[in-house]
């Protein structure tokens, strides 16, 4: 499990941090060393083993916490808002890491309120509102359902035909409806 806000032991080196968590799962020293080396390689932190955790950037700490979460080879990796607080470059690096984990057959459950961040990662999603699953399925089907249920509503003071002409030129507009001076536009992207 990787929470949205994660704590790290700042006074530990990266290798000590991994040793600590490996020992929590009753792994032997040999197992911890082997698995830690593989995981730190996976998250691109091999060169940081002897660096104190508090000197790592937020993105590096995030990747370290993924390595920590994987140390016992879980069948499910749960991530809560994994891109929270990351700069754009770190977000991209983290997304590449998650794609790599998915290719290695990890099952990953991600909690996020930013659907666009999930587009390249997920095979299916569920939308929860007020603690209730309101939609679930393939991302493209969910996006179509959301798009079709939430048109952009425009009130035009004059020149409705001109407004319609402009909207029809947009390749993202999938459907339009007109009621006097009110236009509803649905988008496909």
Describe every region a protein language model picked out:
Residues 66:
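Hydrophobic anchor residue at the start of the ABC signature
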Residues 83-84:
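Short loop immediately C-terminal to the Walker-B catalytic DE motif
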Residues 77-80:
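Catalytic Walker B motif of ABC-type/P-loop ATPase nucleotide-binding domains
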Residues 52-56:
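Conserved ABC ATPase signature
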Residues 95-187:
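ABC transporter nucleotide-binding domain
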Residues 19, 23, 30-48:
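Conserved ABC ATPase "signature" region
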Residues 73:
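Conserved catalytic motifs of ABC-family nucleotide-binding domains
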């Amino acid at each position: 499990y990787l929470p949205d806000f994660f704590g790290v032991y700042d006074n530990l080196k990266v290798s000590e941090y991994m040793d600590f968590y490996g020992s929590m799962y009753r792994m032997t020293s040999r197992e911890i060393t082997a698995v830690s080396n593989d995981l730190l390689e996976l998250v691109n932190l091999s060169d940081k083993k002897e660096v104190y955790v508090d000197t790592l950037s937020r993105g590096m700490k995030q990747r370290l916490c993924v390595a920590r979460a994987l140390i016992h080879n879980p069948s499910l990796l749960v991530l809560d808002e994994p891109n929270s607080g990351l700069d754009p470059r770190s977000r991209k690096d983290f997304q590449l890491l998650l794609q790599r984990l998915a290719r290695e057959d990890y099952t990953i459950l991600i909690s996020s309120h930013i659907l666009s961040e999930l587009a390249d990662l997920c095979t299916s999603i569920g939308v929860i509102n007020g603690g209730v699953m309101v939609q679930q399925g393939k991302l493209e089907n969910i996006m179509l359902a959301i798009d079709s249920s939430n048109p952009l509503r425009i009130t035009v003071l004059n020149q409705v035909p001109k407004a319609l002409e402009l909207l029809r030129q947009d390749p993202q507009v999938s459907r339009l409806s007109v009621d006097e001076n009110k236009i509803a536009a649905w988008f496909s992207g």
